[in-house]
Amino acid sequence: CMFPTISGFTRETCDTMVGIGSTKGRTIMPDVSVPRWDAVDIEALCKGAGLIAFDLDNTLARSKKPMKDDMAKVFSVLTSLIDVAVITGGKYALLQSQVVDRLTGTANRSRLHLMPTSGTRYYRWNGRRWTLVFAHDLSDEERAKAKEALERNAREQGIWYSHACGERIEDRGSQITFSALGQLAPIEAKEAWDPTDEKKRRLTQAVAAELPELDVRPGGASSVDISQRGFDKSFAVRELAGTLGMEVGRIVFIGDRMEPGGNDYPAALAGTRAVKVTGPADTVRLCDGIIAGLSR
């Protein structure tokens, strides 16, 4: 079995994964190694799965771009077979334009779960429209402190540039996001800006030291996110599992930033069946396999 590996973990223990990671506690798995999409055992991955969860940017689509036709097709088919979630650091409006607006006629919206701003907000389809189930918003004081600390430290570190494409600091209510090049910068520029994640880590550490009551973490290729402490993708998958009455170990989580420190990695630590992709093309091929596995 090629799920996240723990010492002594074998294919025969796949069924026990449904008990790993409590939806009520804070139990995590140590020493998680997340397999690539082309190294997973599809049959084992699908066995007992209750939900397929995805990161958005560079997993379902390029940053800020809508899903392409091939992705929209397989994603929509998946919602007709199993519950599907999208958990992203982006705001709700981006989920609408990148995912919801691209759904095909085969999609079952009632089985789709939208969790923007790293899962601090949760939306469900009620048959007529998308409704907010919960929101864990920052206070006015917390938002002000986060914005001030981000700008000041970014300036001190030389990464507050004279020109930016779009907003540099975006207030998403439940999350404050700093984008070094601006929210609307080309994806190629974002990906080239900090290939080793050193700049994001340095800014994250400086701001976190000033705001110990908040959770400060690297976001996408050129961003840093701030939310209430404990509200990352591990919280999101536990909260979703609890809402749906399933164990976290029945959730398959697919993302591109599955290395320690990556914003998808907390979902692996929470006990999901985590899988790493390097881009939407990988995700399409993985989904083809999952659809075949679920259809048997």
Positions of the model-derived regions?
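Non-catalytic pre-domain segments flanking phosphatase-related domains
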Residues: 6-54, 70-77, 101-102
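Conserved acidic, metal-coordinating active-site core of Asp-based
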Residues: 157, 161-252, 263
